[in-house]
């Protein structure tokens, strides 16, 4: 089902004032977590590992990589089953904190121009830094249930103090906040907000309890790098 929203109401869905102009943005690290429930987006961080929000732990999960367009095949398409899913130890469905999980793929993804891992952040990002937000949307000709179009936009990172003053940010720990400065609208399918990439490194990933407004709240990946690296060790 598709709805009309505004960027200030639901962050992370990507659309244009002129819906006749659509293009595929480069975001080869994005993977689509396909299930019988709501769509979710993850990030390939190693050929065998995907980082995703823990609330995306869904039945019959399949990981889709490469080209997502069902009517156009280009040889980059891959669908891989998970063999292990590890949620962050402190995650709870009742709170927005620690909303991370790692997915180990049954076999390594085959890397190509549309399938590439993304490096994890090594430092906290400075407030005011303009970062890239990546997500998935529905192309104009797609009337199906699953998104098929990678989309990017830019937004500045807020300071922790600014974030804590907002309705969305005050209840989040280990968060990263961005300020949306443009509002466009068109009909689109609801999809997860996905990622924040700063200086070509994964800095933030969506949380599951978005509250609306013009501020996007993300889990600060840098705060969890030790857990991610220890869990996703290639044996």
Curated annotation (Swiss-Prot):
Keywords: Cytoplasmic vesicle, Disulfide bond, Fertilization, Secreted, Signal. The gene is PRSS37. It is linked to Patients with unexplained male infertility (UMI) show a decrease in the number of sperm cells compared to fertile men. Sperm exhibit also abnormal activation of the proacrosin/acrosin system and premature proteolysis of ADAM2. The lineage of its organism: Eukaryota, Metazoa, Chordata, Craniata, Vertebrata. Disulfide bonds join 40-56, 131-198, 163-177. This is Probable inactive serine protease 37. Plays a role in male fertility. May have a role in sperm migration or binding to zona-intact eggs. Involved in the activation of the proacrosin/acrosin system. It comes from Homo sapiens. Residues 20-233 form the Peptidase S1 domain. InterPro entries: Peptidase_S1_PA, Peptidase_S1_PA_chymotrypsin, Peptidase_S1A, Trypsin_dom. GO terms for cellular component: acrosomal vesicle; extracellular space; nucleus.
